[in-house]
Amino acid sequence: MKRFETLSGCACCPVHRRRFLATGCAACAGAASLVGVGRLAHAAEKPDKTRIRVIYALHAEVQPGADWPNVGFDFRPVMARIDAALKQGCPDFEFVTSMAKTPQDAQKIIDGDQSAGVDGYLVYQMNCWNRVVQPVLATNKPTLYADFQYGGSGGYLVYTAGFLRDKRPNIGLVASSNPDDLVAAVKCFDVVKKGGTVEDFAAATARVRKSLTPGPSNMACEPDRLELLDVKDCLAAMKRAKILTVGRTFPDIVPAIVKEMGIEVEDVPYAELNAAWEAADKDKANEIADRWQKMAKTIEDVSRKTLEESAAMYLAQKEVLKKRNANAITINCLGGFYGGHIHAYPCLGFHELCNEGLIGACECDVRSTATMVAVTAMTQGRPGFISDPVIDTSKRQIIYAHCVASNRVFGPEGASNPFEILTHSEDRKGASVRSVFPVGHMTTTLEFGPERKEILFHQGKAVEAVDDDRACRSKLAAE
């Protein structure tokens, strides 16, 4: 764990992180990296200032491996901008900045703070799964938990859900792309400084968040003539369906899927899929690669060889589906690729299957695949979009993100939308899809929990096909 401490006080002090301000001097605008000062300069600050420990939860300053946002991502300028926003927006606060990768790193920081007069903590989830906020919350000090969007969002939402279920009293939440929202939440630490409780702090942050979240915009949607199967025919279609799982590692809910949804599930070894890939017709693969090159709006950092290998993987998926009389396949993609079990990413193959009214699903996510089977049957061919959600309260948006998506969202016979072929985002390898989704339509998000006999359901109006290089390639923002 690399620990850096940066005090925010006088903007001109050379040992402090520089400000990134339009009104600042040119020399100050150039500093992007964290600077370790090695001491706490108490004398430089007024004793009555509210002192906040800022902990960035991340793997490293420059990301070493495949994860959100992406391999090679440089967090240093991001952290510098956050520090600058805090300094500018909260001049009556003192910020002491550190980084932590593990709970043990966080605990060392906490132990060192025992005599440092820290009034509260701001934990910024920069990567998804670094469990840093948990030991911080255990201090019972007021803790503001913030999400670096498209970087820490997965862990942030999962951990936040647990904190809400546990009714943790000392946590405030920020999930906003607007730094002013962060500043407003940080100012709530003064509630405790002035004698309030941690519960008062948490309540104040909630009020601020709600007050800064904009109200609904025009929610009128484009017309969409959706014709659904009746219940009897939909259930019959589900019973005719079969899901193939390759490299299954998700929690075993297969018995519940079979019992409650009537969908058959069958395991397939990597070796069978890889053999079909090796045996795929090279001429057909070349034809498919030609079509992709012709139809894609953009192809970036993906070679012709990779396109042909991806086309062969699509043909392999089709062959295995045909051989086993199935209409859905879900693959533990990265586990197979990095384990040497498969040698081409299946993303473009999934894209093609979904365009055809079949189901290709990422990560051997059998729960989402079963949901897709049911809803594709019910909507008579409309594809699902497995997604990892991101919240942006400043825009009143939820952003759905993944590296596989159809570009025929209204079904195989419906209108198509533009798509781009890019690398798989987290590791910048292989080939995947950015679907430039249509906007103005009502979207419905579902997840079936057959083992609990529950369905999660919400709706939102599609308002933006987000183009951001971080995290998964296809992104759709809904309000």
Give, region by region, the residue ranges found by the protein language model.
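N-terminal twin-arginine translocation
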Residues: 14-19, 30-44
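Anaerobic metallocofactor- and corrinoid-dependent redox/one-carbon enzyme cores
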Residues: 47-52, 56, 70-81, 101, ...
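N-terminal secretory signal peptides
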Residues: 1-16
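Conserved, well-structured core segments that form the ligand-binding/active-site neighborhood
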Residues: 23-24, 161-381
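Metallocofactor- and cofactor-centric catalytic cores in central/energy metabolism, strongly enriched
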Residues: 44-158, 210-236, 259-325
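Flexible loop/turn segments at secondary-structure boundaries
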Residues: 62-64, 102-105, 129-132, 152-153, ...
